[in-house]
A protein has these predicted regions:
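Short, positionally conserved secondary-structure boundary motifs
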Residues: 1-67, 99, 139-145
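A short glycine-leucine-enriched loop at secondary-structure breakpoints
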Residues: 68-72
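Short coil-to-beta-strand transition motifs
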Residues: 73, 95-100, 131-132
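Structural motif
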Residues: 74-75, 89
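Short, compositionally biased
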Residues: 87-101, 105-111
Length: 145
């Protein structure tokens, strides 16, 4: 059974800083209001989403095994390979040649790759299986459509 897949690896490349405005108020979901009077600052999404540019890459998500963690089909994962893949982190793993995104469980010598959707079972990593952790997911970018 294919649990979940990630596709299209893309390296983050250093480029021009793109500062986006951040407004100092919470947006009401009702009547629109003029916003420019409330401009607080500008942010660069590179700074907000990427701590280690030379060890960060982006993956596109397919499948629904991680929807409970806010990782939706069609979303993009920001992955940092310099972060230690510890218990509880969401990781990009290759198990027996298959790429997946799951929450890492490491306790008392047991390693599991845990989905965040009750439709799927945990992947218990057996000693004879090959497991490689590519990196830790640091951010998720999901479409709203």
């Amino acid at each position: 059974m294919r649990q979940d897949a990630v596709e299209e690896i893309g390296m983050v490349e250093a480029g021009a800083i793109i500062n986006l405005p951040v407004y100092a108020f919470k947006i009401p979901a009702g009547f629109p209001s003029p916003a420019d009077d409330y401009l607080e600052c500008r942010i660069d999404l590179n700074e907000e989403l990427i701590e280690h540019p030379h060890s960060t890459f982006i993956l596109n998500v397919s499948g629904d095994s991680m929807i409970g963690a806010g990782i939706m089909p069609g979303g993009k994962l920001v992955v940092d390979k310099s972060i230690e893949p510890s218990h509880g982190k969401i990781v990009i793993a290759v198990i027996d040649g298959q790429l997946t995104v799951k929450r890492l469980y490491k306790r008392r010598g047991v390693i599991k790759l845990m989905p965040e959707n009750p439709k799927y079972s945990p992947l218990i990593v057996k000693q004879e299986q090959d497991l490689l952790i590519w990196g830790v997911v640091t951010n998720v970018i999901n479409p709203l459509y």
